[in-house]
Amino acid sequence: MSHDRRLTVGSLLPNQPRPVAVPKAPSVVQPSKQPLPEKAIIRLEQNGRSFSVRHVKGNLLTEGLSQGLPLQYKCRKGTCGVCTVKVTDGASRLSLPNQQEHKKLQGNIKSGFRLACQANME
């Protein structure tokens, strides 16, 4: 008859607690349910409506649409101006206006207007 139990000095002592195997906790990191910090939001207005775009690296129009925002647009090339938005918060997190924006928006850039199809979040 074979025994799987090993005898040790400690196991031979009476009234000694027996070691218990503790299962390891899984090392899966749960995503945080906390709201995004304010600095991670770009706030803008278009045609009298206000929108908040979560800041991720990429094009402002493309990311806004992928986040379910009903932003108006047409050409995506910066020529029609339909995607013009006024950035009310977070402008410093956007790329500098490019030549196409300067041409289409002229002096309105100083008032916070951008072409969403040309502005990139950095």
UniProtKB/Swiss-Prot annotation:
GO-annotated biological processes: intracellular iron ion homeostasis
Residue sites binding [2Fe-2S] cluster per the record: C75, C80, C83, C117
PROSITE patterns xrefs: 2FE2S_FER_1 (PS00197), 2FE2S_FER_2 (PS51085)
Cofactor (UniProt): [2Fe-2S] cluster
Gene expressing this chain: fer
CDD domains referenced in this protein's UniProt entry, alphabetically: fer2 (cd00207)
Cell compartment(s), UniProt: Encapsulin nanocompartment
Region (Disordered): 1-33
Record-stated family: Belongs to the 2Fe2S plant-type ferredoxin family.
Gene Ontology cellular component terms for the protein in this record: encapsulin nanocompartment
Main localization category: other
Role, per record: Cargo protein of a type 1 encapsulin nanocompartment. An iron-binding protein probably involved in iron mineralization in the encapsulin nanocompartment. 2 different cargo proteins have been identified (IMEF and Fer); when both are expressed in E.coli with the shell protein only IMEF is detected within the nanocompartment. E.coli expressing all 3 genes stores the largest amount of iron and is protected from Fe/H2O2-induced oxidative stress.
Renumbered residue ranges of the record's region Targeting peptide: 8-14
Presence of keyword Zinc: no
InterPro entries linked: 2Fe-2S_ferredoxin-like_sf, 2Fe-2S_ferredoxin-type, 2Fe2S_fd_BS, Beta-grasp_dom_sf
GO MF: 2 iron, 2 sulfur cluster binding; metal ion binding
Coiled coil: none
Record keywords, A-Z: 2Fe-2S, Encapsulin nanocompartment, Iron, Iron storage, Iron-sulfur, Metal-binding
Domain 2Fe-2S ferredoxin-type: 40-122
Domain text: The N-terminus (targeting peptide) is probably responsible for targeting to the encapsulin nanocompartment.
Record's protein name: Ferredoxin
Cofactor comment: Binds 1 2Fe-2S cluster.
